[in-house]
Swiss-Prot record:
Keywords: Ribonucleoprotein, Ribosomal protein, RNA-binding, rRNA-binding. Belongs to the universal ribosomal protein uL10 family. The keyword RNA-binding applies. InterPro entries: Ribosomal_uL10, Ribosomal_uL10-like_sf, Ribosomal_uL10_bac, Ribosomal_uL10_bac_type, Ribosomal_uL10_CS_bac. It holds the Pfam family Ribosomal_L10. This is Large ribosomal subunit protein uL10. GO terms for biological process: translation. It comes from Pectobacterium atrosepticum (strain SCRI 1043 / ATCC BAA-672) (Erwinia carotovora subsp. atroseptica). It comes from the Bacteria. Part of the ribosomal stalk of the 50S ribosomal subunit. The N-terminus interacts with L11 and the large rRNA to form the base of the stalk. The C-terminus forms an elongated spine to which L12 dimers bind in a sequential fashion forming a multimeric L10(L12)X complex.
Length: 165
């Protein structure tokens, strides 16, 4: 489909605005995936706070120029689906990783987080980041365990002191 200059500028402006507020980005190749499966992926992405769009590679290069996602430029080859995580850095990576397990033709190319290129083989680094709620839960359980351990040690010391007396 041929795009005129105004359409291209509108696409670059829209995706650039999203990229400015994004925490991470993941690039994938969706050749061979059925429309129904892609619709499911897009729906899951909206629910997870992930912005997804298929954009021409030349336009994507303009979008990422001067941003933390510039390291992805070399991955813009062939049909490119880009996903930006808006709420949690690992959301898009987790979504694409799970989708790739169920769809063999879906290929994750790379990801970017804080200006660092993460190859597809290491996408788990980003996908396994805990969500904010999970991190809080882990912190609270650690704090709770530490307090309980301290209480047990204090009671044991009091018991030992009474036995010695």
């Amino acid at each position: 489909m041929a795009l005129n200059l105004q359409d291209k500028q509108a696409i670059v402006a829209e995706v650039s605005e999203v990229a400015k507020g994004a925490l991470s980005a993941v690039v994938a190749d969706s050749r061979g995936v059925t429309v129904d499966k892609m619709t499911e992926l897009r729906k899951a992405g909206r629910e997870a706070g992930v912005y997804m769009r298929v954009v021409r590679n030349t336009l994507l290069r303009r979008v990422v120029e001067g941003t933390q996602f510039e390291c992805l430029k070399d991955t813009f080859v062939g049909p490119t689906l880009i996903a930006y995580s808006m709420e949690h850095p690992g959301a898009a990576a987790r979504l694409f990783k799970d989708f790739a397990k169920a769809n063999a033709k879906f290929e994750v190319k790379a990801a970017a987080f804080e200006g660092e290129l993460i190859p597809a083989a290491q996408i788990d680094r980003l996908a396994t980041l805990p969500t904010y709620e999970e991190a809080l839960a882990r912190l609270m359980s650690t704090m709770k365990e530490a307090a309980a351990g301290k209480l047990v040690r204090t009671l044991a010391a009091v018991r030992d002191a009474k036995e010695a007396a």
